[in-house]
């Protein structure tokens, strides 16, 4: 786990718990996404990493965000600025999104295939994964011709490698031993 994730997690958890309590998870996600995009701006990055007083930084950041942040969202920005943590806002969004997915019983599957998958293949893979994990699964597909054929599925810490490349690698290892 990266240091940024370790720093971001408590902020995301606090915001998420509050959002669940207020029944406002989607609006909080929107606020955090907007604030994270603002924090990625080059000019804003320079200000975040400058020697500006935390109170001034929070006030400036909240002014830039304007009405996109409610009072509680502005309070989160203020606390993060006071602790010198505004630079981890994108990681806070990632952690918040993961908590939301857990609440919604959703998983994201990273599918890497040697060739483009047809819609029928995607549906079949999605249904199989949903049956296995008992959750709604969103597919994120990408191509990697180096797999030769087959695919690799990553969900959280689980990896299902059904690629020709890995089978050839295992065969080569078996022949060498």
From Swiss-Prot:
Keyword Membrane set for record: yes
TM stretches of this protein: none
Keyword tags: ATP synthesis, Cell inner membrane, Cell membrane, CF(1), Hydrogen ion transport, Ion transport, Membrane, Transport
Main location per the UniProt record: membrane
Gene Ontology CC: one annotated term: plasma membrane
One example GO MF annotation: proton-transporting ATP synthase activity, rotational mechanism
Record's function text: F(1)F(0) ATP synthase produces ATP from ADP in the presence of a proton or sodium gradient. F-type ATPases consist of two structural domains, F(1) containing the extramembraneous catalytic core and F(0) containing the membrane proton channel, linked together by a central stalk and a peripheral stalk. During catalysis, ATP synthesis in the catalytic domain of F(1) is coupled via a rotary mechanism of the central stalk subunits to proton translocation.
PANTHER family on file: ATP SYNTHASE DELTA CHAIN
NCBIfam families reported in the protein's UniProt record: ATP_synt_delta, PRK05758.2-2, PRK05758.2-5
Name assigned to this protein: ATP synthase subunit delta
